[in-house]
Swiss-Prot record:
Role summary: O-acetyltransferase; part of the gene cluster that mediates the biosynthesis of the indole diterpenes penitrems. The geranylgeranyl diphosphate (GGPP) synthase penG catalyzes the first step in penitrem biosynthesis via conversion of farnesyl pyrophosphate and isopentyl pyrophosphate into geranylgeranyl pyrophosphate (GGPP). Condensation of indole-3-glycerol phosphate with GGPP by the prenyl transferase penC then forms 3-geranylgeranylindole (3-GGI).
Annotated pathway: Secondary metabolite biosynthesis
GO molecular-function term, one example from the UniProt record: acyltransferase activity, transferring groups other than amino-acyl groups
Protein EC: 2.3.1.-
Position of the signal peptide: none
Keywords for this protein: Acyltransferase, Transferase
Quaternary state and interactors: Monomer.
Keyword Transferase appears in the UniProt entry: yes
Native organism: Penicillium crustosum
Statement: the UniProt record of this protein carries the keyword Cell inner membrane: no
Cross-referenced Pfam families: Transferase (PF02458)
Protein name as it appears in the record: O-acetyltransferase PC-16
Length: 494
């Protein structure tokens, strides 16, 4: 019997907080000679797995005696020679055929041909944690990627893509960012915190304990697919110059707020805070329009974001760690702020409104500052103590299959800094020209797409919401002032 590729190892508690699904996207590469280029990623994949064999692994229930119920592990493939890299030839299709979003009627099926696995993994047998599909088109290459999200987070995805590209370059690719030793060391740091949960934090809201996944998962899938028929997916872009100008306006209002100064705070917001808040603000404006008396808005609105903790601990997690080094930021803001009724039982909103009025700014700008500052303040609480408390809480969960996401109105994943466009595949391929995400299936799911190289920078956002809400969002005067409902190709240099 041959020696396994690697020894099986258990997932961390943070890995178990992620629902079972694949993160999927594809990268496009216009190339003059497809026949030559198609061999490059195939050879690169073999080199890649030889150096990092755990990426050929499968996710399955842990079989070690005495482990907690629900504990999952990564184990080597049961059979040798199962390819991580698949190849498909599309002799009658070009890159342009793949670039249009399929929107509601086709439920993203236009993209499925270029992706290696479906969105939902099977739960009754071991499933691969990483797959790539090489699609040979008439005028280029499409690389379809799939990563099991219970094993790999967005930062890890970017690292894997860059290292995969290095292996595609062959001997000249240079050293990898991922090392087997750092993976083991980082998992150990995330597995043990050295103390009880901090009583200041209520982790039940972020990670409530529910019943294990029901046996009728197929029924759940069908419900989600039917619901997806009512959704619309759209790409938007915001020029970075407009983001920077609006951020400076908001930070100026914060610096000029006497009340915030009196509290001894030195408030500021980042570009990411601002983009998330602008989307959050405009979505609630169009979901609960003032002229529609038939829609009664809730008392508040909530958002959930994943926060990279690699640099937030006193003993930092290695930046090349590819597992889930994320905790959830969950923040709620009173609906009065979104509907420009600042001051209704909201002292912070009243402060922002008074400062904006004194500076001659618009009411929606005051609301934006109020919302962005709430996000920034919550982000500032996610430090070493908070992360260790989360880890300790998860260590005490009796059955890891019961850990779930708390409910929120919007889920936003920022891939802005994962570095996908920095990946250089060399040879006949070079850098990717575009990244595409399949149409979304869930109302209120958004991705801030990776930063591009070039002289015309912008923020790209992949938005999935109800069809009627999408129409109103596109027409919203604030959103339209900063965005264009165009494909992200407009953000790159022509």
């Amino acid at each position: 019997m041959s020696k396994p590729l690697f020894e099986a190892y258990p997932l961390t508690g943070l890995d178990h907080t992620i629902p079972p699904c694949y993160v999927r996207f594809f990268l496009t590469f216009p190339v003059p000679d497809v026949a030559l280029a198609v061999n490059q990623p195939q050879k690169g994949a073999d080199n890649f797995i030889e150096k990092l064999p755990f990426l050929a692994g499968y996710l399955a229930p842990c079989e070690t005696p005495g482990v907690r119920p629900g504990q999952l592990e990564i184990r080597p493939p049961a059979e040798e020679g199962i390819p991580v890299c698949l190849v498909a030839h599309h002799s009658n299709s070009c890159l342009a055929d793949s670039s249009a979003t399929s929107t509601t009627e086709q439920l993203g099926t236009a993209n499925e041909n270029y992706l290696p696995v479906p969105f939902f993994p099977e739960l009754d047998k071991p499933v691969p944690i990483f797959r790539v599909k090489v699609n040979a088109m008439t005028d280029g290459i499409i690389l379809g990627f799939a990563f099991h999200h219970s094993v790999i987070d967005a930062t890890g995805i970017g690292t894997i893509v860059r290292d995969f590209a290095r292996c595609c370059r062959g001997p000249d690719g240079g050293p990898l960012e991922i090392s087997l030793e750092s993976q083991n060391d980082s998992r150990e740091k995330l597995r043990h915190c050295g103390g009880p949960p901090d009583p200041r934090f209520d982790h039940n809201k972020e990670y409530p304990l529910v019943a294990s996944l029901p046996a009728d998962l197929e029924g759940m899938k069908q419900v989600l697919i039917q619901t997806a028929r009512l959704m619309s997916t759209q790409y938007f872009r915001i020029p970075a110059s407009l983001v920077n100008a609006l951020k400076e306006t908001c930070n100026h209002m914060l610096r000029e707020s006497p009340a915030l100064k009196d509290e001894g705070e030195n408030p500021w917001i980042s570009s990411n805070d601002l983009v998330v808040s602008l989307l959050w603000l405009c979505l609630n404006r169009v979901r609960y329009p003032a002229e529609n008396n038939n829609v009664i808005p809730p008392s508040d609105s909530s958002v959930c974001m994943a926060v990279n903790i690699r640099g937030r601990m006193k003993s930092p997690i290695n930046p090349g760690y590819v597992g889930n080094a994320i905790v959830l930021l969950r923040e709620s803001v009173g609906m009065s702020a979104f509907l420009h009724k600042l001051g209704d039982g909201d002292p912070l909103g009243a402060q922002c409104y008074e400062t904006a009025k004194r500076l001659g700014r618009e009411t929606w700008e005051a609301a934006l500052v109020r919302i962005a500052l709430a996000i920034r303040r919550k982000l500032n609480t996610i430090n070493d103590s908070y992360v260790r408390s989360v880890i300790s809480y998860l260590e005490g969960v009796p059955d890891l299959s019961t850990v779930a996401f708390g409910q929120t109105d919007y889920h936003i994943s920022s891939w802005r800094d994962i570095g996908v466009y920095e990946a250089d595949f060399g040879g006949h391929m070079g850098h990717p020209s575009d990244m595409r995400v399949p149409d979304g299936m869930v109302d209120g799911m958004f991705y801030i797409l990776p930063r591009r190289q070039g002289t015309h920078p912008c923020w790209e956002i992949h938005v999935t919401i109800h069809q009627d809400t999408m129409k109103r969002l596109i027409a919203d005067p604030v959103w339209a002032r900063y965005t264009a409902g165009k494909t992200p190709s407009l953000c790159r240099d022509e």
